[in-house]
């Protein structure tokens, strides 16, 4: 299965099927074994069993992402072109996008209008947001971003919800969903969200961050998407797997 040749690798994300080949990306330090100098690593496969490690898809070479190209998502846009959506780590945490320069998806070019989201929405004290997940409902593209709410007696995880007509211009809507750690044990901040319709229901997966001895864990709820909010069937989530070793799930339709 997928295995990097060397150095730091974590958080696989952005699973994509294009022209008969699967692509997946990851946080990668190409020159050292520690978490730092983060770019987007890239693997490709014809069958999801045999993987080739490609050159990094994105590197931090602009002011708005100078502190790292952090996790995000990949989609096929309305023109049938793959598009990367990533967390741009600059002086503030924002969102950047990129487009391929070749059909093999080896070379990528950042959008000239980056960052498409410059920073977190007004009214929230936490400054970090990360890990986009993007999907389409009808004619509207939606994006959620992992976040946390600090300005309460009980800090908790949350998901910022944005929408767009073209995957370039994004408007903040509200919080898609908030946790309640006293009830659901979902922690103070959520990473690597996935929001996927399966059958007639939606599955929301989040990764709570480790905090005060509580380990990271991938949890999920099943529910509905109504009035641009997630409504869980049960306020208490389930654990995605038993031994707590899966922390950045990705999904793709084939």
Outline where the language-model segments fall.
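Beta-rich carbohydrate-recognition and catalytic domains
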Residues: 1-131, 135-185, 197-244, 254
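Acidic/histidine-rich catalytic neighborhood
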Residues: 194
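Repeated scaffold domains used in trafficking and secretory/extracellular systems
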Residues: 247-249
